């Protein structure tokens, strides 16, 4: 359900930002939007530290990718609900008008600057790993620098894909980048447990060539293809091997190459 109300008066919180909307997608997934600090400048794909105070008044902070693009007036986040998670056990209950802590110091490797120029850009994500790509899919630079953008998103069930599906659908009608996206963005969602028209792990669909066949495109080529990866540790490791088998090399902000991996969230109890 969507909630939207006028912004409430600020409480005394360090780096406080006010929640402007909350949506629960499944019993384990939710997204929310907050006010944006006037001083915050970030590149689409980066993350910030957000949090809440615990019972003793101490901040519980975790890294969260900004799911909204750099041009958005608000900030959006997409989160899993962990019942016993130090932060998400509290964060999942936030309501419009309440506040969170947001440290306005964005960082991250999933930025276009960390890739060499190319023709095709792949976003490879599992679960809430789609968050940085929710930002990048709405980033005009992605479509100005690449001829094609391919979003591969794998979840266990169809319901868990809904956040990404609705985002891609809305992009087509977006007044700012709808025309840029047209004909360039390809969306390839898959499930790993529930029956769906596309099934299987991203690594398997890439390694077998099934995704290329389904989309009617050429296989990966280090001369033309660039990729960004965000998921669990096991996913990151496995997909890196597949990308390397196609001749792509891992890069970084300081040394742009053919693909980059976000490792900030791996193994983090949330």
From Swiss-Prot:
Keyword terms, alphabetized: Cytoplasm, FAD, Flavoprotein, NADP, Nucleotide-binding, Oxidoreductase
PROSITE patterns attached to this UniProt entry: FAD_FR
Catalysed transformations (reactions): 2 reduced [2Fe-2S]-[ferredoxin] + NADP(+) + H(+) = 2 oxidized [2Fe-2S]-[ferredoxin] + NADPH; reduced [flavodoxin] + NADP(+) = oxidized [flavodoxin] + NADPH + 2 H(+)
Any Pfam family hit: NAD_binding_1
Effect of residue 264 to Y: 3-fold decrease in kcat
Record-listed FAD binding positions: 62-65, 78-80, 86-88, 128, 264-270
Cofactors (names): FAD
EC number: 1.18.1.2, 1.19.1.1
Residues annotated as domain FAD-binding FR-type: 12-113
Highest taxon in the source lineage: Bacteria
A molecular function (GO) term: ferredoxin-NADP+ reductase activity
List of residues binding NADP(+): 126, 156, 192-193, 201, 238
GO cellular component, one term: cytoplasm
Flavoprotein in keyword set: yes
Annotated compartments: Cytoplasm
GO terms under biological process: cellular response to oxidative stress; heme catabolic process
Gene induction: Induced under oxidative stress conditions.
Described purpose of this protein according to its UniProt entry: Transports electrons between flavodoxin or ferredoxin and NADPH.
Family: Belongs to the ferredoxin--NADP reductase type 1 family.
Quaternary organization: Monomer.
Name recorded for this polypeptide: Flavodoxin/ferredoxin--NADP reductase
Organism whose genome encodes this protein: Rhodobacter capsulatus
């Amino acid at each position: 359900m969507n909630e939207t109300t006028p912004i409430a008066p600020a409480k005394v919180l360090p780096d406080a930002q006010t929640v402007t909307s909350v949506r629960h997608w499944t019993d384990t997934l939710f997204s929310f939007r907050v006010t944006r600090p006037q001083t915050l400048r970030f590149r689409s794909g980066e993350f910030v530290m957000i949090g809440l105070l615990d019972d003793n008044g101490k901040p519980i902070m975790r890294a969260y990718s900004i799911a909204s693009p750099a041009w958005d007036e608000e900030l959006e986040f997409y989160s899993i609900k962990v019942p016993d998670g130090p932060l998400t056990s509290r964060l999942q209950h936030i309501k419009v008008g309440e506040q969170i802590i947001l440290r306005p110091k964005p960082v991250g490797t999933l930025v276009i600057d960390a890739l060499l120029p190319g023709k095709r850009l792949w976003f490879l994500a599992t679960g809430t790993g789609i968050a940085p790509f929710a930002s990048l899919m709405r980033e005009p630079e992605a479509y100005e620098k690449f001829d094609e953008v391919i979003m591969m998103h794998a979840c266990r069930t169809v319901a868990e894909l809904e956040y990404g599906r609705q985002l891609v659908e809305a992009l087509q009608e977006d007044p700012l980048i709808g025309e840029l996206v047209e004909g360039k963005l390809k969306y390839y969602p898959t499930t790993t447990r529930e029956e769906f028209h596309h099934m299987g792990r991203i690594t398997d669909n890439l390694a077998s060539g099934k995704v290329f066949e389904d989309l009617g495109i050429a296989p990966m080529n280090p001369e033309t293809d660039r990729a960004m990866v965000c998921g669990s540790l096991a996913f990151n490791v496995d997909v890196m091997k597949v990308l390397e088998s196609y001749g792509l090399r891992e890069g970084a902000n300081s040394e742009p190459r053919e693909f980059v991996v976000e490792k900030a969230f791996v193994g983090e109890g949330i």
